[in-house]
Regions:
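Active-site loop-to-helix junction immediately N-terminal to the catalytic Tyr of the SDR YXXXK motif
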Residues: 3, 107, 153-161, 173
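C-terminal substrate-recognition "lid" of short-chain dehydrogenase/reductases
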Residues: 86, 139, 219-248, 253
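Conserved glycine-rich cofactor-binding loop
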Residues: 12, 19-20, 43
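Alpha-helical segment proximal to the catalytic Tyr-Lys
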Residues: 132, 176-180, 239
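Residue(s) in the substrate-gating loop at a strand-loop-helix junction
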Residues: 147
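Substrate-binding pocket helix/loop in short-chain dehydrogenase/reductase
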Residues: 103-104, 108-116, 211
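Active-site helix of classical SDR
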Residues: 127, 163, 171
């Protein structure tokens, strides 16, 4: 199989929550195979800086923008800017998300709703905004960053697990809706990676070791280990892959 199938020259990828963590890592990976980029987060300065750095490193076109994924008007503004400056969105990586760690009894309804709004409704908003342009082109990739915790439970994560499980079924549903339009829709389920969101666990030796003990490979994921999966799902190489989930968790959910 030719490695040209993994190249993305002439395509534009939008990564939500792309200014840091796995989002920034995936943005670099996609730029590394030729994709132009749209980086969005809630902070314009972080998004602009990330886009500038990646554009200079990989010699691609990119812009950064502030967008709250829970606000359709802000999401639609990003899509409109991408249409003007980069020819529209070809690849959407729904990565923005948060986690609030509290038990069901301790969880205020406002915290529950905030996680659901950002992790589940936000990606729906982005896909709804980006899909019409993909339909016009007859080609597109929508990728949801779910989690291994969308497949298995973990105490003190009720809205996070619910939202990430929702993304898996949202991907399956939209895969059926958009198949006739040349658009594939899939989900990635990462296990523990050393991201900003996981700092509380990284800084707690007992909690960290508890997680490691459940991973057959025996360690947390290294950031670059997400690269191959995102490139595959974003590229022509995955043209017959839709409505499915790829888990990157060191074997946690195999048990």
């Amino acid at each position: 199989m030719s490695l040209d199938l993994f190249k993305l020259h002439g395509k534009t990828a939008w990564i939500t929550g792309g200014a840091k963590g796995l989002g920034f890592q995936m943005a670099n990976a996609l730029a590394g195979v030729g994709a132009n980029l749209v980086i969005s987060s809630r902070h314009a300065d972080e998004s602009v800086a990330a886009a500038k750095q990646i554009a200079e490193t990989h010699k691609v076109r990119a812009f950064g923008a502030a967008a709250d994924v829970t606000k359709p008007a802000e999401v639609e503004a990003v899509v409109a800017q991408a249409e003007r400056e980069l020819g529209g969105i070809d690849i959407l990586v729904n990565n923005a998300g948060i986690n609030i760690r509290k038990s069901t009894i301790e969880m205020p309804l406002e915290d529950w709703q905030q996680v659901i709004d950002i992790n589940l409704t936000g990606p729906f908003n982005c896909s709804k905004a980006a899909a019409p342009g993909m339909i016009r082109k007859g080609w597109g990739r929508i990728i949801y960053m779910s989690s291994m915790l969308g497949q298995v439970g973990l105490a003190a994560r009720p809205p996070y697990t619910a939202s990430k499980a929702g993304l898996i079924l949202l991907a399956k549903t939209q895969a059926l809706e958009f198949a006739k339009n040349g658009i594939t829709v899939n989900a990635i389920c990462p296990g523990p990676f050393g991201t900003e969101m996981n700092k509380p666990l990284l800084q707690n030796p007992e909690a960290y070791q508890n997680f490691v003990s459940k991973i057959p490979i025996g360690r947390w994921g290294e950031m670059h280990e997400i690269d191959g999966v995102i490139i595959f799902l974003a590229s022509p190489a995955s043209s017959y892959v839709t409505g499915t989930t790829i888990t990157v968790d060191g074997g946690w959910t195999a048990q």
